[in-house]
A protein has these predicted regions:
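Histidine-centered metal-chelating micro-motifs
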Residues: 49-52, 70, 96-100, 104-110
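Short acidic-glycine-tyrosine-enriched beta hairpin
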Residues: 76-105
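Conserved catalytic-core motifs of eukaryotic protein kinase domains, centered on the activation segment
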Residues: 75, 113-114
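A short hydrophobic beta-strand segment most commonly corresponding to one strand
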Residues: 101, 116-136
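Conserved hydrophobic/aromatic beta-strand scaffold that supports enzyme active sites
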Residues: 26-28, 40-44, 61, 91, ...
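A short, N-terminal "cap"/entry segment at the start of jelly-roll beta-barrel domains
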Residues: 1-38, 52, 91, 136-151
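A short beta-loop-beta micro-motif enriched in histidine and acidic residues
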Residues: 32-38, 47-63, 87, 94
Length: 151
């Protein structure tokens, strides 16, 4: 049995800046504890930063750690892979200690809601099948009505 700690700057995952609206960094937690059924990260969103709109091929669980954030769920309209209409259908506030489950293939965004304070959460990405790769599809959007392309 292995253990790790969610705090500290070690074990950083290289983050593609095109996946976020502002500076964000991720600490890999699953590597040291040898987790094989899920990828686990401590994700830090700088002031006002959010993920871009995206969905995963597996379920995801978020646990609020620091600050105030939100999870926003969107519905897709249209059949094309990119350049489609969207509508926000739910906004869930995430405070320290809150936990939320996001089903696979749910179009969503999450991150900080305060432009003056950071927000962090634990993300547990549950693999769709044992020994499979957890995949995320990222989109450019206006967060209101339109997705313009896959990032």
């Amino acid at each position: 049995m292995k253990k790790s700690n969610i705090y500290g700057s070690g074990d950083q995952r290289k983050v593609n800046p095109e996946w976020f609206t502002n500076k964000t960094w991720m600490k890999v937690l699953s590597g040291k504890i040898k987790s094989k059924d899920q990828d686990i990260y401590h994700v830090h969103f700088e002031k006002g930063s959010r993920t871009k709109l995206h969905w995963h091929n597996g379920n995801q669980v978020l646990i609020g750690v620091k600050g105030k954030g939100s999870l926003e769920i969107f519905k897709k309209y249209g059949t094309t892979k990119s350049n489609f209409k969207i509508k926000k259908v739910e906004k869930i506030t995430l405070n320290e200690g809150d936990i939320v489950h996001i089903p696979a293939k749910t179009l969503h965004t999450h991150g900080s809601t305060d432009k003056k304070k950071e927000f962090s959460h634990i993300a547990i990405n549950i693999l769709a099948k044992k020994n499979s790769e957890y995949k995320t599809t990222w989109y450019e959007s206006d967060f209101k009505s339109t997705v313009t392309k896959i990032v």
